[in-house]
Amino acid sequence: MAHLSLNQYKCTHIIMHGTCLSGLYPVPFTHKAHDYPHFNIYISFGGPKYCITALNTYVIPLFHHLLSTQFIYTYVNITKKSPLKSPKHKNILSFNDNT
């Protein structure tokens, strides 16, 4: 099986239905400190709580399964500079190639 890469699949919008997650907003960018591409996935929630259980149960295993050559290297809260038309409460999962 050929390994998947974020560079091969240019998604602009992914919707996930659930009690906590309202949508995913992938935003490609290049980190200043590195010469390899990064890919941000903005995870939006319907309320002020971040629903870590939903992330651990559904989202993270999903990306580990679909993006076997990628890995999560950071997980931070986003409070400013949010994407246009995105809900207030959101976290961000950042992926980069592990090669």
Swiss-Prot record:
Domain of life: Eukaryota
InterPro entries per record: DUF468 (IPR007414)
Pfam families named in the record: DUF468 (PF04318)
Family: Belongs to the UPF0320 family.
Protein name, as recorded: UPF0320 protein YER188C-A
